[in-house]
């Protein structure tokens, strides 16, 4: 006759299984978990029975959140021993190694989130500070791009645009003054000499045709000026004096 071996049960524990395990442990104690699993009639392994008892069914377990003293002690012991959860659990009565490990992971996850939230406002404020200290208008950006595109010729172009020179509107009076300037002899002008002469006389100055029809010595150099005038648009026989 062939006996059919039942399959080992896995998954969540029921209330009936918890009661059977508690009664068996009270009878035989917390040892020989393979024997307890067999005697109790539970279709569970010895390891599963032990973990269920230690983490959930032990009467000395503490329930609820960690106290501040327990939290501080966990941090100190972990800094000293690392991830040796069973050794840390011995220093905290009523707390299991699995519970301590879960608390540590939750604590580290919360600490990482706080660090990330503290870093994000500082980075955004630094970018805003840089933008406020270094504003770049669209015209500045376009000017920089044009300067880079033309190989640095943007400065020359801007200077030429800012200081336009209108050669067509160059006054002819200024041209004649520049032509006559090198030939004028230094000394008092004719008007000053006329005033000084009038002041030196005791009586009133009599009218004399020479004063009204005086022509500067530039008229004597008519031939030389006619040669220069055509390059400025004047025809033959046209000069500064008539």
Curated annotation (Swiss-Prot):
Indicate the principal place this protein occupies in or around the cell: nucleus
Where is each HTH myb-type domain found? Answer: 5-61, 62-112
DNA-binding region(s) in UniProt:
33-57, 85-108
Low complexity: compositionally biased ranges: 118-133
| Disulfide partners | none
What exactly does this protein do?
A: Transcription factor.
Q: What gene name does this entry carry?
A: MYBAS2
Biological source species: Oryza sativa subsp. japonica
User: PROSITE patterns in the record, alphabetically?
Assistant: HTH_MYB
Protein name as it appears in the record: Myb-related protein MYBAS2
Cited InterPro entries: EOBI/EOBII-like_plant, Homeodomain-like_sf, Myb_dom, SANT/Myb
